[in-house]
Amino acid sequence: HAPFDHTGGVAELCAALPGVPVYLHPADAALVGGDVFPAVGAETTPYQDGDVVKLGKMDIEVLHTPAHTPGGVTLKVGDVLLTGDTLFQGSMGRTDFEGGSYAEIMASLGRLGRLSGDYHVLPGHMGASTLEQERKTNYYLREAMEG
């Protein structure tokens, strides 16, 4: 998503690896390069909920999980969820940034919590977990699933 802690090295990465695509949800693309978030430093390719991005032999499914920003996504790769700033080990992302929404993060958490099966959860910050562990112990995820 668009905040600098996730996009700050994109220009250097693209310089080192020309032709590597940079994906960004359109809801966050609208926020970059202005007063909210600095420019990403590379051309971006939009992706939407339900899209599947191919990376070698891997299929990466895009789940739109707005919360921290309106274009937040979770990437599902096999039995792994890359949850960005939506779901953390024992917590959730902040919603006090431009475009953040408590109601949206709760809906996004509910969506993740209701996925069938178990997944390894790799957030954008803090430690790794599993979805089953978070279903049992994460107050915010439990509230979202009940709501």
Predicted regions and their residues:
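Histidine-centered active-site/metal-ligand motif
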Residues: 1-6, 25, 64, 68, ...
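Active-site HxH/HxHxD metal-binding segment of metal-dependent hydrolases
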Residues: 2-56, 139-143
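Metallo-beta-lactamase
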Residues: 31-39, 59-64, 69-147
